[in-house]
Structures are given as C-alpha cells and as structure tokens.
C-alpha cells in the first residue's frame, strides 16, 4: 500500500504544473478545451492512406544514380497512380526537389532502419548562388520537372536564403517519405538557417524518418492561405534554434524532438509556428517526447517555442488579427527536464513579448494572446 501511495504521489507531483487554466506564462487547457484539438481536427477531413513499401517502380542505386533522377522519371510518366521510389541503403550527398505534380510519390529507404539511408548536404542559407550551382547544379537540366525550383535559387543574388537551403523540398501533394534520414549538416556557432526538409503542399506523410540539423531543420508549411497539412509519425527531429517552424497544419504523433547543444548552449527553441491568424490549426504534438542534450538539463535555457512573426519587422508593427499568430498544442506528451518550466515560451521573432491567456473563460483564438497551449503532459519539464 505504501508503494502504491508513493507512486500515486509521484504522478501527481509530476503533473502538478499541468492543472488548468495554468499561469500567464504557461497556460493549460481544460479537458473540455482539449477536445477541440485532436489528430482528427487537425487533419481537417483528410484520411491519410496506408503506407506501403512492398514495391519499387524505381530504385536508386540500381538503375538510377541519384534520387532526383528517379523523381524526374516518376513524374515524367504522368498519370495519377502512385509511384514508389526505393532508395538503397547508403549515403547520398544531393538535394531532392519535388515540384507540384499530380503523380503521388512514395519515397522510402531500403535499409532495415532510417539510419541506413541518409540524404545529406552542407548547405546553409548563407551559401552564395555560385556555390549553390557548384553543389547541386549537375542534378538539373532545363527540361527537368524541378528545374524551375533549382533555377529560382540559382538566380538569386547575394545568398540563397532559408528556403533554398533545403535538402529535401516538397511542393507536390500526397507525398509519402518513409524509413530514411534527411540531414542539413551545416553548422557554425552563430545564426545559420539550414533546412533539412521543407513541405509547401498538402497531405504529406512522414513516417519512421529522421530529420537532422541545427537551426530550421524542418520547415513545415509556407504559411500561405491554402491548406498545407502534414502528418508525422514515429519520426525523430533534432536541432537547436526554431528547428520546427512554418505556417502549415502539422500533426506530430509518437515523435521525438531532440534539442542539441553541440553548436551553441546559450539558448534553444524547439517550435516556431507562423500560423495565419484566421487558421485555427497550426502544430499539434501528441503522445510525443521532447528531450535533449544533458547541457540543457543543468542550464534550463531551452524553450518549447516562440512565435515566428513572419514579415513583421518589430513588435510595434505587429497587428493582432492580421499578423501571423503561431498556433501550437502539446498534448499528452513527455517533456524532459531541459525546459524552463516556469517560462517555457519566449519572445517572438518580431520582439513581441509572449502573452499567455490563463483566464477561466477564454477564447482560444484571441489574437491579443499567443496561441500556445498544453494539456496533460508529464515529465520533469512539464
């Protein structure tokens, strides 16, 4: 009986800070409020199809020397039948661009685990167009389906910027990415955006994958007025600054978010959503784990997130209801002791001070407040 009582007490203590309505620095949803935020509501009527890796219409490493060549071939066949691209285990130093196409693609690693198949490149946002062309230009010809994506980056002046730093870029709907690793290996001690995966389309599925990088690892949704839904399951995502960011509707279920400290240890931010203020659904983290390097356990300087106020130059230029207002729910997940528990959210990219709504009666989409919420999380950082 004593053991049972102690265990129950431990559970209560671990979840004590998850009591609704929370505090102004850490708002918590009530049970009834949390019912508005489920996988189904974020999917918004989409039923993701099952994923199969039992066939291969194209094989990279046996018939195709690059992933891009296999993607081009699949798109050029036309039609609306799903095409399957198998990537044999190995390391591929290249970019992969999937332009808008009606051909649904499944791209999967042929190894026994996602670590066996790695797509990697060192390509930060500060890369010059000439260096970019030297890195990836050999992959593209003017008649290729994705040439316009390449050319838009190659023709930039100065540097290529955040979007063009992407290693794996998806602009087509209904793409499935399975059992592989995508890495942008760029690393320095300052601010250096370097995107591993970017999705600018709808109905994207990422399963059993690894997304590796530091700053801006995953760019999930462009923030356009169109619907951009993506569904991540059993996927590992690592980084340090804003390493999950963007304006799409993204569901992360049974995923791991790992905060690294090998590049910088002064601060870290996991999520930076850029949700349109008229959209109710941004990022949904469900039954997942947020953890990281031991350096954050002692300093407690890592933050769960901040708002990416894209296009807003300063806090005084922010207009509630017009400017972006990132939306994020973390629900029934484990948050390790790497997070500043008393203040897990930090100042927006515009300089706008974080403002949480812990009123007993509240509008969860009131744009005078940040739209960051938690429900029924556990762990030393909850």
Swiss-Prot record:
This protein's name: Pectinesterase
Enzyme class: hydrolase
Organism: Sitophilus oryzae (Rice weevil)
Alphabetized UniProt keyword annotations: Aspartyl esterase, Disulfide bond, Glycoprotein, Hydrolase, Secreted, Signal
Disulphide bridges, residue numbers: 153-164
Family classification: Belongs to the pectinesterase family.
Gene that encodes the chain: CE8-1
GO molecular function: pectinesterase activity
SUPFAM superfamilies: Pectin lyase-like
Location of the active site: 216, 242
Glycan-modified residues: 179, 340, 376
Pathway: Glycan metabolism; pectin degradation; 2-dehydro-3-deoxy-D-gluconate from pectin: step 1/5
Its job: Pectinesterase which probably plays an important role in the digestion of plant cell walls.
Transmembrane residue ranges: none
Gene Ontology biological-process annotations: cell wall modification; pectin catabolic process
Miscellaneous comment: May originate from horizontal gene transfer of a bacterial enzyme to an ancentral weevil genome.
Catalytically driven reaction(s): [(1->4)-alpha-D-galacturonosyl methyl ester](n) + n H2O = [(1->4)-alpha-D-galacturonosyl](n) + n methanol + n H(+)
Marked site: Transition state stabilizer: 215
